[in-house]
Amino acid sequence: MAKNIQAIRGMKDYLPGETAIWQRIEGTLKNVLGSYGYSEIRLPIVEQTPLFKRAIGEVTDVVEKEMYTFEDRNGDSLTLRPEGTAGCVRAGIEHGLLYNQEQRLWYIGPMFRHERPQKGRYRQFHQLGAEVFGLQGPDIDAELIMLTARWWRALGISEHVSLELNSIGSLEARANYRDALVAFLEQHQETLDEDCKRRMYTNPLRVLDSKNPDVQALLNDAPALGDYLDDDSREHFAGLCKLLDAAGIAYTVNQRLVRGLDYYNRTVFEWVTNSLGSQGTVCAGGRYDGLVEQLGGRATPAVGFAMGLERLVLLVQAVNPEFIASPVVDIYLVAAGAQTQSAAMTLAERLRDEMPGVKLMTNHGGGNFKKQFARADKWDARIALVLGESEVADGTVVVKDLRSGEQTAVAQDSVAAHLRTLLG
């Protein structure tokens, strides 16, 4: 017997019971995006490696440790996308979507990072991201945060997520802070772990979100990023906070909040949860006004976010399981008798025409009534339609409520109206 081939470690199959949950959640997210006027863009999974090195930064963990990079048969270095913003910016430049224009875009799909697989984190994972180009005020930053807050309300998880905000200022202000932070860390190297010592000179702001408790205690005495902000960044951040206050969106200013990718400036934010064990980030983003120019386009203000769908699905399942309790099948059509199968399929097609969106499954493969009702139970159907030879002859169908056990014979011409009443 040939050896079974298994899925690659960290790359998960999503089976039918799971995909129904994902579709329900994704549908909710997409509806909210549409209500704000955002348009979908579909991007390649594979990009040229220099795109990510230039966008993300060569001394980030993503580029140094986590990217899936390979040479194709032409000798070109290609990478499975580890995130979506760089590809979205590349597409915007390539197709002339950005300069002197306003764009509100969203995308969804798999991303790839060679990380240690754990609950809610895989090597192939799925992100939904939104990017806005051509707007530089704090009002669009606020709109993106309001959009995400509307998601949480629609999914019933608002009480289980909290918003953290920060401003990391302009590139110049951050460079000044970087020098002050490095000088401080150099005086306390004995407290730093090896990872922080490495980051101290390559990407020192990443030391701020170290999970090491000794390092976190040390950082209480470190220079504060907020003290180094330029006046424009202070004004921008104050404007954002004022808009969120007016909208009733609670937040915490976390001066240690930085993002792991080099392209961010000014606003950064994260929605975090404590409802999945240790604190985890559900959605994160910020402003990246220099990235379009960095990738070869003309200077264009930009802001966006990305959300990991695996973690979001886990959170909805944990705190609001009723949201995803949707049956696979609403109606199961039971047909018994040599002459009934054709009539059953004709009736099923007519009901699908008359009741768009109904989940109706027709029995196939024969079987007596007992076996067919067992199949209806397996699919957790709410209603069974029973069509025997006598029903075919007199143009009726038996409608049975599988929850209450009540049943009634209904003319086939009026069964759709009867079913709408039962299904609500």
From Swiss-Prot:
Q: What is its EC number?
A: 6.1.1.21
This protein's source sits in the domain of life called Bacteria
Q: Which InterPro entries match?
A: aa-tRNA-synth_II (IPR006195), aa-tRNA-synth_II/BPL/LPL (IPR045864), Anticodon-bd (IPR004154), Anticodon-bd_dom_sf (IPR036621), His-tRNA-ligase (IPR015807), HisRS-like_core (IPR041715), HisRS/HisZ (IPR004516), HisRS_anticodon (IPR033656)
Sorted keywords for this record are: Aminoacyl-tRNA synthetase, ATP-binding, Cytoplasm, Ligase, Nucleotide-binding, Protein biosynthesis
Keyword flag rRNA processing: no
Main localization (coarse): cytoplasm
Pfam families listed in its UniProt record: HGTP_anticodon (PF03129), tRNA-synt_His (PF13393)
Subcellular location(s): the record lists: Cytoplasm
One annotated GO biological process: histidyl-tRNA aminoacylation
A GO cellular component annotated for this chain's UniProt record is: cytoplasm
Q: What class of enzyme is it?
A: ligase
The terms under GO molecular function for this entry are: ATP binding; histidine-tRNA ligase activity
The record's Gene3D superfamilies line, in alphabetical order, gives: Anticodon-binding domain, Bira Bifunctional Protein, Domain 2
Q: What is the reaction catalyzed? A: tRNA(His) + L-histidine + ATP = L-histidyl-tRNA(His) + AMP + diphosphate + H(+)
Query: Is the keyword Cytoplasm assigned to this protein?
Result: yes
HAMAP family given in the database record: His_tRNA_synth
Task: State the family it belongs to.
Answer: Belongs to the class-II aminoacyl-tRNA synthetase family.
- Describe the protein's quaternary organization and the partners it interacts with: Homodimer.
User: What protein name is recorded for this chain?
Assistant: Histidine--tRNA ligase
Specify the species.
Answer: Salmonella gallinarum (strain 287/91 / NCTC 13346)
